[in-house]
Amino acid sequence: MKAKLLILFCAFTATDADTICIGYHANNSTDTVDTVLEKNVTVTHSVNLLEDSHNGKLCRLKGIAPLQLGNCSIAGWILGNPECESLFSQKSWSYIAETPNSENGTCYPGYFADYEELREQLSSVSSFERFEIFPKESSWPNHTVTKGVTASCSHKGRSSFYRNLLWLTEKNGLYPNLSKSYVNNKEKEVLVLWGVHHPSNIGDQRAIYHTENAYVSVVSSHYNRRFIPEIAKRPKVRGQEGRINYYWTLLEPRDTIIFEANGNLIAPWYAFALSRGFGSGIITSNASMDECDAKCQTPQGAINSSLPFQNVHPVTIGECPKYVRSTKLRMATGLRNIPSIQSR
């Protein structure tokens, strides 16, 4: 009896209707998606997959603040430009933020060898130990360590020099041959930096080093170079016709680095024992630091999103959505929004 009543009910319901809807319910959705064969296909439902917004700020990543270089470049920071001295108080960071046009870089003009490679190495560093590799007061008893200053590296109106390098000069009219070595006992890679001075004239060469035929030799298991100063007049840069070329190497644990010279050495003073961290990096950005926390940082600003894709910037640090160049990316969760109606 129940079965008969159900059949009668269905029959009466069909009789009262003017039309029968075949398939699925249409709606007033204007969502469009691109398919393999068609573009801008209207569908009943879709979800957005693309994050296109950011907060315009530099934020902490997982609670760890970045190292914001301010007016200093990577070169100015790592060499110890006097105007960048305050940066050494920060020993660890989530990432490094550098502005596009940093004013404080190499204060004494010259060439920085393999600079982009150094940036690449530092991009994976999340902390370091800065230490005296050759203590200033005890390492160079036969040379002067206090007169190597210059107006181009001035600090608070006075001539100065890099905080991580020492400009060795003659002492009592002599510049004895020097030989100094360091054994890496840090159990980490150690970044060592030094320079070679190229005076603008022979008079300066004699006055500073008391030799005309100088050389600088630097040797380790993975590095071996001999430098000969090039004495020549050059166009003035920051008031200097001379140049200092800057060099660096990574010293493996238990390896030894040896410096030998009879003039023109800009000696290491401080070096860095490096700790590498997954997810660190260097970004170039004009964004300002804010009291915010994020999982993903871009040069434009931080992204806080659970979406799988973003078009904010291709350079990212942290746990970030995958970058795509698309301006729209939606996934259809419904069907094509074209109903079919059949009249009785």
Curated annotation (Swiss-Prot):
Gene3D superfamilies: 3.90.209.20, Hemagglutinin Chain A, Domain 2. GO terms for cellular component: host cell plasma membrane; membrane; viral envelope; virion membrane. SUPFAM superfamilies: Viral protein domain. Its main location: virion. Glycans are attached at N27, N28, N40, N71, N104, N142, N177, N286, N304. It is a single-pass type I membrane protein. One of its GO terms (molecular function) is host cell surface receptor binding. In natural infection, inactive HA is matured into HA1 and HA2 outside the cell by one or more trypsin-like, arginine-specific endoprotease secreted by the bronchial epithelial cells. One identified protease that may be involved in this process is secreted in lungs by club cells. It is found in: Virion membrane; Host apical cell membrane. Keywords: Clathrin- and caveolin-independent endocytosis of virus by host, Clathrin-mediated endocytosis of virus by host, Disulfide bond, Fusion of virus membrane with host endosomal membrane, Fusion of virus membrane with host membrane, Glycoprotein, Hemagglutinin, Host cell membrane, Host membrane, Host-virus interaction, Lipoprotein, Membrane, Palmitate, Signal, Transmembrane, Viral attachment to host cell, Viral envelope protein, Viral penetration into host cytoplasm, Virion, Virus endocytosis by host, Virus entry into host cell. Disulfide bonds join C59-C292, C72-C84, C107-C153, C296-C320. Residues 1-17 form the signal peptide. InterPro entries: Capsid_hemagglutn, Hemagglutn_HA1_a/b_dom_sf, Hemagglutn_influenz_A, Hemagglutn_influenz_A/B. The keyword Signal applies. Major glycoprotein, comprises over 80% of the envelope proteins present in virus particle. Homotrimer of disulfide-linked HA1-HA2. Belongs to the influenza viruses hemagglutinin family. This is Hemagglutinin. The gene is HA.
